Amino acid sequence: MDSDNDNDFCDNVDSGNVSSGDDGDDDFGMEVDLPSSADRQMDQDDYQYKVLTTDEIVQHQREIIDEANLLLKLPTPTTRILLNHFKWDKEKLLEKYFDDNTDEFFKCAHVINPFNATEAIKQKTSRSQCEECEICFSQLPPDSMAGLECGHRFCMPCWHEYLSTKIVAEGLGQTISCAAHGCDILVDDVTVANLVTDARVRVKYQQLITNSFVECNQLLRWCPSVDCTYAVKVPYAEPRRVHCKCGHVFCFACGENWHDPVKCRWLKKWIKKCDDDSETSNWIAANTKECPRCSVTIEKDGGCNHMVCKNQNCKNEFCWVCLGSWEPHGSSWYNCNRYDEDEAKTARDAQEKLRSSLARYLHYYNRYMNHMQSMKFENKLYASVKQKMEEMQQHNMSWIEVQFLKKAVDILCQCRQTLMYTYVFAYYLKKNNQSMIFEDNQKDLESATEMLSEYLERDITSENLADIKQKVQDKYRYCEKRCSVLLKHVHEGYDKEWWEYTE
């Protein structure tokens, strides 16, 4: 806009975590590995991440702009657009700025080079008695018009309507371009602040540019918990366990619940596979077969054994009973009378391979889901344990003495979460000597975890109080130790490249 006002738009509006329609707001999809065993020994306090409120996010955004401008010395709105273009990577922006052709640099970022001031436009507008709005074609005095450095000018009502539509209806923030047809110059935040008077639209705009800032910045991530408005800021980006102020614990790299020992890329594949397969896999296994030629799944909906594949590129005719070609069956439409089983055996072997693959998937899926379902009872279990703690205090035990129960539930939930993700890890793992050691560790931890769960569900009486306390303490310490052993072994395997994968 034709204005020297560089004040930040966000001074008087709230900010928040909402989805943005701007380009470049997709997840950065970090493809990095879990830290090495040596790195994991480092105390978690050494990974100095911060949990930021939306106001702190806005302040952090200002700080980055100010730091960049110490060298750029550009108008603040221009610097904001440039930083957004470079995904808020200040170093990359400065490198390109000082290395590239200046005009080309600003052109790629869709801003006018501020060093090439459009004096002609300013002189034209100052001499004119009236100007024509390029949208509604009204003749208005210059002070009723506004425009960007590209020279396209529109009346205030047209600007307001245009910007409101882009912000509210289309969900655009940092990537709103000039209203002139074919002009790709971006509208800066100061222009929006001066032209948009509707408080609802202003708040929405600030939410969008704040969200864009977080999603573009590889050192920031919104907490994925429902309705949480916090973001986590990290010193460097890698798969790390971060704990939001809302209580949610997640992996910074992918945003999923913390999933040690499985890596982000395998968890992503697993979640997609579960979404695609789990709801219908059991029914498919019981009621369908695959075409022996193209493997398309076919349901038998009548008594006839003569099957015709509906795949337009296949049209294979085969026998439902033996899966062999239908042609040698002659006119025997209802009963398979083939004597030579060679071809049928080949077809059945292929069918069995597919069934075996499905059975393997269901083995790991069912155990994964079992631990997930158990974890969903966490709140109920905490409530039950709280009641037990109160009962124990009635048996002359102090508040401090009964804290072992809460500690036990914490470790139980931690072990269940670890076990849940070990089945994802195991599903993609090829068999070797180290994988057998892993499975032994997994079995040992699972057995101990189930026993701890059983202890916590027992009724507590004055007669068994001492016995239950000793058993719970011994078992949760054992679970904690075995969980640590399992994770250490898996990460040692990552470091020494023991693990090979099926896909």
Curated annotation (Swiss-Prot):
SMART domains: IBR. Its EC number is 2.3.2.31. This is E3 ubiquitin-protein ligase ariadne-1. Keywords: Coiled coil, Cytoplasm, Metal-binding, Nucleus, Phosphoprotein, Repeat, Transferase, Ubl conjugation pathway, Zinc, Zinc-finger. Changing C304S: Loss of catalytic activity and impaired autoinhibition. Residues 1-11 have a biased composition (Acidic residues). Atypical E3 ubiquitin-protein ligase, which catalyzes ubiquitination of target proteins together with ubiquitin-conjugating enzyme E2 Ubc10. Controls the subcellular localization and morphology of muscle nuclei (myonuclei) by regulating the protein levels and distribution of the LINC (LInker of Nucleoskeleton and Cytoskeleton) complex. Functions by mediating the monoubiquitination of the LINC complex subunit koi leading to its subsequent proteasomal degradation. Can form homodimers. Interacts (via RING-type 1 zinc finger) with Ubc10. Interacts with the LINC complex member koi. Interacts with park. Interacts with ari-2. Specifically interacts with isoform ECR-A of EcR. It catalyses: [E2 ubiquitin-conjugating enzyme]-S-ubiquitinyl-L-cysteine + [acceptor protein]-L-lysine = [E2 ubiquitin-conjugating enzyme]-L-cysteine + [acceptor protein]-N(6)-ubiquitinyl-L-lysine. It is found in: Cytoplasm; Nucleus. It comes from Drosophila melanogaster (Fruit fly). Residues 1-40 are annotated as: Disordered. Gene3D superfamilies: 1.20.120.1750, Zinc/RING finger domain, C3HC4 (zinc finger). It is an enzyme of class 2 (transferase). Residues 341-361 form a coiled coil.
